[in-house]
C-alpha cells in the first residue's frame, strides 16, 4: 500500500540548518539534507497513525518553480500528493501567497481533498488581523498561512509549528483506511464517507465567510474542526 505523499517546498535563502530544523520540528524526524525524498515517516495522533513520504524541494525564484511544477511532466506528482507545505520569508508576503493560490486554483485537481500550508518564516510576522483576513480569503482553497515565529499565548489557538501539526492531524487521509489506536490494541477502520465530509466542509466554508466578528469565527472553526475530526475517527 502506497504511503501518503506530502510536498515540502523550501526557499534556497534559508540556511541548511533551518531546513533541517523545520522538517525535524514538524515531523519528528532526523532529516538528512542530502535527501530529496524522506520515506516511511510515521505520523501519529491520539486517534490514528499513518505513513508519509516527504518530497522535499527548494526554489530560488518561486514563479520559475511553479512554471516547472505545472508542466505535464509533473502532473502525476500533482495528482498523488496529499498536501503541500510551502515555506517563504519575503518581506512582502502577498506575491508568493497569490502565486500559490493561483497554482491551487488553476492546476491542482480536486484540491478540496488536499491541504495547503504556507509557512511565513520571517520574524516580522503577519499581524493577527491581516492574517485573519488573508486566511478568510484562502479558505476555499484549503490554504492556510501560518506565522512560524508567532509566540504561543494560552488564550490563543495553536500557532507556529503546533498549528501546522494540527492541520495535518485533522486532514482526512482519504486514499486508504487508516489504523485506529484503541486501548493497547489496534483495529482497522473504513474510509470516511467522502461525500458527507466534503458537503460539510463546503457548508462550513460558506458559513465561515459570513462572520464579521473574528472571535465568533474562531469559535466556529474550533467547532467544525471537532466535528470533522469525529467524522475521520
From Swiss-Prot:
The keyword Secreted belongs to this UniProt entry's keyword annotation: no
Tree of life domain: Eukaryota
S-S bridge residues: none
Keywords assigned by UniProt, alphabetized: Chromosomal rearrangement
Listed GO biological process terms: vesicle-mediated transport
Pfam family of the protein (one): Adaptin_binding
GO molecular function, one term: protein-macromolecule adaptor activity
Purpose of the protein: Involved in gross chromosomal rearrangements (GCRs) and telomere healing.
Family designation: Belongs to the IRC6 family.
Protein name: Increased recombination centers protein 6
Lineage: Eukaryota, Fungi, Dikarya, Ascomycota, Saccharomycotina
